[in-house]
Amino acid sequence: MSHLVSIIIPCYNNADTIQEALDSVYNQTYKEFEVIVVNDGSQDQSAEKIREYQESYAELIFLNQDNRGPSAARNYGASIAKGHYIIFLDGDDRLHEEYISTCIDHFESDATLDLVYSVTELFENESGVFFLAEYDPKTILIQNCFPITAMIRRKDFFANGQFDEKLRIAEDWEMWIRHTREFPNVKKIDRKLFFYRKRVTKDSISDLNKVNNTIDDAHLYIYNKHYQLYREAGWHIIDLLSSRREYLKYKKKYYDQWFKKVFRWVKGVK
């Protein structure tokens, strides 16, 4: 039995890459899918590029919203999705042509699965495999274990509460923390079927952190939101700090900013 798959693509200033992302979807060997692109208030030529693509693929669903961040854009797309399964793909990344068919094969061969994903390969400014820790309920509390493109059931996504729209970064990690608590059976495909673009831009994580401590605020928010889970797992805020510090390779001055912020926050917790 063929199941419809909804591919939801948030797009913010991706004029130079959105058609490449769409090509990777429309070149899939599995053809039972719908594509929903949500323009999140782009200020470049993204909207024009998407409309141009619609000239060849009239069935492409194109939505516009004011800039509210990737969480809100994905939730908006999901709200009109009709697929049995959903995949979120960012507007500057790509899927291997067999990504959907391979995920579907695993779901159909094992009805107990809740989430299927593949090895991630970097491209553009970096190459090689993008490291993600193997999932277990404790590890995911200190680092993300899944790419945004993991395939899940649409009904499970809504049962889980969707993306937290208060987050504009690390929103996928926070969502996976919640999702895997309710739907813990995951399958990793040992093939490079998702391509994650690494770019050198002013939007990079380190630059965001310089401007307004975006990462720090997100991690503190996640720790506070899931405080009981961290306590039950035996993780403390310093464990989260150490893990992210190593993973992101911040410079020392940013470690110091983070630690001072954490210290002030912890002092306020009674």
Question: Which role does the model predict for each range below?
Answer:
Residues M1-N213:
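Nucleotide-sugar donor-binding/catalytic module of glycosyltransferases
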Residues E174, R181-K188, K192-K270:
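C-terminal subregions of glycosyltransferases and related glycan-biosynthesis enzymes
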